[in-house]
Swiss-Prot record:
InterPro entries: Ribosome_maturation_RimP, RimP_C, RimP_C_sf, RimP_N, RimP_N_sf
Region (Disordered): 189-208
Database matches in CDD domains: YlxS_C
Protein name: Ribosome maturation factor RimP
Main location as per UniProt: cytoplasm
Gene label: rimP
UniProt-listed GO biological process terms: ribosomal small subunit assembly; translation
Origin organism lineage: Bacteria, Pseudomonadati, Pseudomonadota, Alphaproteobacteria, Rhodobacterales
Classification via PANTHER family: RIBOSOME MATURATION FACTOR RIMP
Family recorded in the similarity comment: Belongs to the RimP family.
Domain of life: Bacteria
GO cellular component, one term: cytosol
Role description: Required for maturation of 30S ribosomal subunits.
Cellular compartments annotated: Cytoplasm
Length: 208
């Protein structure tokens, strides 16, 4: 069953059931899916490799495979644009394992119901315990660790910090995506947040 952080609306969950196996067969994981309606309809898919480091070519491969599957299944009534992107540096946290993977980094979390008079929490992730997400909060100058049931969460994402940027770049360097010169230059310039996107027509975009 797809959780509400990956796919919030009923149509998103239906689409997730269709595209998740396609993405998995290519060796990737679905991070988030949203069908956005307005003047035009856009299907936004966020995917990643199990160990991170998804690139433009990966987005293109996912876009082509998903597009072919959706053409057959035809779950979307209106004409739409398909956008496939990486999660970006200040990525959403949609799976329980994400909170364990990014332990030690700052995050913002929202819950569906009020907890001790609040729904929004910001602090350092402290891993997981069973089905609970642990987060360190600053309360009157003291650090307090609380546990939030994963099923209570309505939204969660990393906060963009220098430490997070450097860690993501180190991972990309270790994966061979960045060479030594690129790594040093990017760290000094402190890049803006964003994710490479591959639209259905094959054009590249930058999401902010």
């Amino acid at each position: 069953m797809t959780n509400n952080l990956i796919a919030k609306a009923a149509i998103d969950r239906r689409l997730a059931e269709i595209v998740s196996p396609v993405i998995a067969d290519l060796g990737y994981e679905l991070v988030r899916i949203r069908l956005m309606s307005g003047k035009s309809t856009t299907l936004q898919i966020m995917a990643d490799k199990p160990d991170g480091g998804i690139e433009v070519d990966d987005c293109a491969a996912i876009s082509n495979a998903v597009s072919a599957t959706l053409d057959v299944e035809d779950p979307i009534l209106d004409a739409y644009t398909l956008e496939v992107s990486s999660p970006g540096i200040d990525r959403p946290l949609t799976r329980l394992k994400d909170f364990e993977m990014f332990e030690g980094y700052e995050a913002k979390i929202e819950t569906t119901e009020m907890i001790d008079g609040r729904r929004r929490f910001r602090g350092e992730l402290a891993g997981i315990e069973g089905n609970e997400v642990l987060i360190n909060l600053d309360q009157n100058g003291e650090t307090v660790t609380i546990g939030l049931e994963f099923d209570w969460l309505s939204d969660a994402k990393l906060v963009l910090t220098d430490d997070l940027i450097k860690e993501m770049l180190r991972q990309r360097k270790a994966a061979g995506v960045l060479n030594e010169d690129q790594f040093d230059e990017i760290v000094e310039e402190a890049p803006e947040t964003g994710a490479t996107t591959m639209a259905r027509d094959g054009s590249e975009e930058e999401t902010k």
